[in-house]
Amino acid sequence: MLEIIFEDDHDAAAFLHLIQHSDDRNNIIVREGIRKIGIEKANPAFPIQRFMEPILVKFFLECKEDEHMLSLIEETYCFTDQDEQQQILQLAHSIIEGEADDLPFEPLKLSRKQSILDELQTICLEEGVFYIRSFQTFRLGSYYKQLRDITEAAIDEYKMEQEYQNFIQTLRDYVDAKQPRIKKVHIVHDGSFTLWELRYVPEREKMKYIDRRFVRDHPMYIDSHLLAPLISIAPDEVVLYTDQPEHMMARTIQNVFQERVEMLPLHAFTDAEIPVKHSEG
């Protein structure tokens, strides 16, 4: 018989649930104890090792992984607010599932599973005693290194998102406090973004529209081509023509100007509908 020892009743119950939903459940006999589960063969020819490996992998990935990352988030990186912890954890999930852009973690789903399986295959799971905590402590170093890297990347992403949200709020406050220099502007996104009212204005003249002090205070985020003049003009209405509403710049314009923005598909744009000369507000 193989006996598995758990740290608490919750882990034992979670593991038992995985066993009960296994396709090979009828090939084994389960004996329940206090924080332990015994596994015996119902069929003498059935290998317990083959049965246990995928269940243990699933247990560590589905039942213990979030617990470990939350422990890192709180105890190692000192995020004690539960809402913040959950936001970081969700970002970690996005990284694991490959949903986060520009992060070098594409093969993680496979490698995490393989890291655990490789260690399980070095020990005998046909009989004896298997301690969950000991296996975590002494065998899963490579796997936990991956989780630490994922957690650090998620925290970096979270901090960047917080900075972005603070920046957006700063732009909103700035725009709300200004009188519009042009009442209505049109932005055309066709490969690049063009502020249509200023398309024929010389670069030197465009600089007159830009609040240089504000741009100087936010150099990392404000580009001089579009966002700087747009924010400085502070229009009452922004018509944005784009076929990519999820583009970062399109989202930024929406987030800053909110209800002032009307977003239309690119094919709806016609130059003839826009006055050649703009009117000062």
Swiss-Prot record:
Superkingdom field: Bacteria
**By its UniProt entry, which InterPro entries does this protein fall under?**
Spore_YtxC (IPR014199)
Recorded hits in Pfam families, A to Z, give: YtxC
Protein name as catalogued: Uncharacterized protein YtxC
Provenance organism = Bacillus subtilis (strain 168)
Lineage at the top is: Bacteria, Bacillati, Bacillota, Bacilli, Bacillales
